[in-house]
């Protein structure tokens, strides 16, 4: 069982020199505006730390959170950072992710050696948006051998049972979701515990 021993806000950065020192592995959370990024982070960490922006697209800040997870089964305690990036795709005409994030944010993703895992949140109701395809391509083009990219589907509980099953069958594995009520889902779908275990496994594969 994974227990979140600590989770707290570190800092917000708009320039590289403002970012915390790269002393521990880091997980980046990215996704379109209104995809449910804050909800996912708060569910994952068991604490209301991430706030939704009142003006999507206006603030180009990266928010850093320090977290400590205990894997009781394996008697392992790990500290790492979660980086919450601003939502993309807020413009009426979607630009490329690289264009929206040119400057600080793109530089952060390109050069920060402590980033080990990218979690791309995708709205389960809107699977084929160009901006998400572009984001996936851009992030995968950045990946170093010691980094991983995973998709995670938000708003899974907004789908009917047939839609949930179809997504489960066709989505890339590992199949990861966020939902308001994990316990209300069929047992074939991942629980919050499984989501945490999966993310921790990827982070520990290539420690800093």
UniProtKB/Swiss-Prot annotation:
Alphabetically ordered keywords of this record: Cell cycle, Cell division, GTP-binding, Magnesium, Metal-binding, Nucleotide-binding, Septation
Short name of one Pfam family: MMR_HSR1
GO BP field: division septum assembly
EngB-type G domain location: 23-205
Top-level division of the source organism's lineage: Bacteria
InterPro entries: G_ENGB_dom, GTP-bd, GTP-bd_ribosome_bio_YsxC, P-loop_NTPase
Cofactor(s) essential for the protein: Mg(2+)
GO cellular component: cytosol
Keyword Nucleotide-binding: yes
Any one GO molecular function term: metal ion binding
SUPFAM superfamilies according to UniProt: P-loop containing nucleoside triphosphate hydrolases
Binding site for GTP: 31-38, 57-61, 84-87, 154-157, 182-184
Record Gene3D superfamilies: P-loop containing nucleotide triphosphate hydrolases
NCBIfam families according to UniProt: GTPase_YsxC
HAMAP family from the UniProt entry: GTPase_EngB
Family: Belongs to the TRAFAC class TrmE-Era-EngA-EngB-Septin-like GTPase superfamily. EngB GTPase family.
Biological role stated in the UniProt entry: Necessary for normal cell division and for the maintenance of normal septation.
Name of the featured protein: Probable GTP-binding protein EngB
Species: Helicobacter pylori (strain G27)
Gene label: engB
